[in-house]
């Protein structure tokens, strides 16, 4: 596992030394597995840092990241703590998890559920109870940031794999 840290300046800009993500003594085993895929893992990502999670096939990268989202966490035996901005994910409800932790699947076909790019971008906001005006504003801001303004009314089936991952 490798961590690239932008240093004290980026942490100071966030206003806190509290890690964005903190993993404490995490172990996880899938049901019926002979061995744990994660065992005694300690890892943290400071706020404002850019982190890379690198490892071989089957080393637990996807498992670890899935465990950070209670609503998609795999079944199995887990020990240890996972904290996001100091809050244990075991104590988060679905709304808090959705507001604090995003997850992009490796295969974008598993995450696209709407027919147009605009509706896909608004989907999460709608599920969080955002007003129509807020959805319009935030989709406009995000599409501008990623240069997707011309794509908003396109069918999601016409997007390349890379565009779907955005």
Spans of model-derived segments:
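Conserved ABC ATPase signature
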Residues: 155-159, 163
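A short, flexible loop at the N-terminus of ABC-type nucleotide-binding domains that lies
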Residues: 11, 15-23, 27-40, 72-75, ...
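Helix-to-loop junction immediately C-terminal to a conserved catalytic motif
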Residues: 69
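Short helical segment in ABC ATPase nucleotide-binding domains corresponding to the A-loop/adjacent helical element
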Residues: 109, 115-126, 136, 140
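Conserved ABC transporter NBD signature motif
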Residues: 77-88, 97
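The feature captures the beta-strand-to-loop junction immediately N-terminal to the Walker
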Residues: 54-57
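Conserved ABC ATPase "signature" region
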Residues: 133-151
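ABC ATPase NBD coupling module
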Residues: 88-102, 127
């Amino acid at each position: 596992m490798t961590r690239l840290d932008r240093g004290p300046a980026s942490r100071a800009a966030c206003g806190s030394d509290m890690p964005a993500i903190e993993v404490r003594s995490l172990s996880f085993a899938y049901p019926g597995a002979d061995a744990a895929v994660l065992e005694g893992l300690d890892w943290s990502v400071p706020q404002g840092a850019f982190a890379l999670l690198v490892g071989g096939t089957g080393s637990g990268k996807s498992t670890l990241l899935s465990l950070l989202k209670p609503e998609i966490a795999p079944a199995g035996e887990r020990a240890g703590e996972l904290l996001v901005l100091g809050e244990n994910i075991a104590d988060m409800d679905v709304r808090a998890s959705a507001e604090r932790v995003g997850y992009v699947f490796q295969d974008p076909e598993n995450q696209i559920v709407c027919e147009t790019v605009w509706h896909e971008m608004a989907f999460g906001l709608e599920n969080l109870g955002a007003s129509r005006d807020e959805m319009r504003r935030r989709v406009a801001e995000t599409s501008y940031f990623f240069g997707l303004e011309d794509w908003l009314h396109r069918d999601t089936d016409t997007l390349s794999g890379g565009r779907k991952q955005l």
